[in-house]
């Protein structure tokens, strides 16, 4: 089980057999400024995604932890200075105390910004969930990630994918013995579209609420192997308590 260190969104060509030479592409270029809560975590290079939940706090994945992180907000094309980005260093990086790097249970992390983000057309917050994600709900997954099944082909512009929440039973059947109550699956059991090696820590937003954090998966766009995400609803109390204790 490998964490998705660079999330992308993939769709295998259904009319052709899958092989390592196929370039799996999927999703679409997000409309600029349409995902204003999406952030890029940078340590000299983009390595993970995250979500702005208030002016000074970001949610990401526990396995994205680094001792020094610069949070980049208002990004669309990460290779171009577009003029409205905000680059803010992390003041505190707090991984969940029960994070398990082997099972990726409790794969969630909070980042406190050293200064408050300026909310504008390019940068805004996303709400925490008020209920767990319902089966069948369509969600938006976003990030900058590898669009090649073999080798590396990283998009400069933010990518988006629309995908449904799968039932917990189907999720557990896809990964026997590996799915905890803190995880859920989003995607397509028939394969063809998936998150794949890229932008862990990035958002899964359903009905305007941050329901998931990109966590892990087995391969890309494989049949019966959907993407696995941290269930943010289970951590709302921890998030609120941690923010209050570190204000």
Swiss-Prot record:
The record marks 194 as: Required for specificity. Keywords: Calcium, Digestion, Disease variant, Disulfide bond, Hydrolase, Metal-binding, Protease, Secreted, Serine protease, Signal, Sulfation, Zymogen. GO terms for biological process: digestion; extracellular matrix disassembly; proteolysis. Residues 16-23 form a propeptide. Residues 1-15 form the signal peptide. Occurs in a single-chain form and a two-chain form, produced by proteolytic cleavage after Arg-122. Sulfation at Tyr-154 increases selectivity towards basic versus apolar residues at the P2' position of inhibitors that bind in a substrate-like fashion. Although the increase in selectivity is relatively small, it may facilitate digestion of a broader range of dietary proteins. One of its GO terms (cellular component) is extracellular region. Binds 1 Ca(2+) ion per subunit. It catalyses: Preferential cleavage: Arg-|-Xaa, Lys-|-Xaa. Changing residue 23 to R: In PCTT; increased rate of activation. Ca(2+) binds at residues 75, 77, 80, 85. The keyword Nucleus does not apply. It is an enzyme of class 3 (hydrolase). PROSITE patterns: TRYPSIN_DOM, TRYPSIN_HIS, TRYPSIN_SER. SUPFAM superfamilies: Trypsin-like serine proteases (SSF50494). Its EC number is 3.4.21.4. The active site is at residues 63, 107, 200. Its cofactor is Ca(2+). It is found in: Secreted, Extracellular space. The keyword tRNA processing does not apply. The modification Sulfotyrosine is found at residue 154. Belongs to the peptidase S1 family. Has activity against the synthetic substrates Boc-Phe-Ser-Arg-Mec, Boc-Leu-Thr-Arg-Mec, Boc-Gln-Ala-Arg-Mec and Boc-Val-Pro-Arg-Mec. The single-chain form is more active than the two-chain form against all of these substrates. It is linked to Pancreatitis, hereditary: A disease characterized by pancreas inflammation, permanent destruction of the pancreatic parenchyma, maldigestion, and severe abdominal pain attacks. Interacts with SERPINA1. This is Serine protease 1. It comes from Homo sapiens (Human).
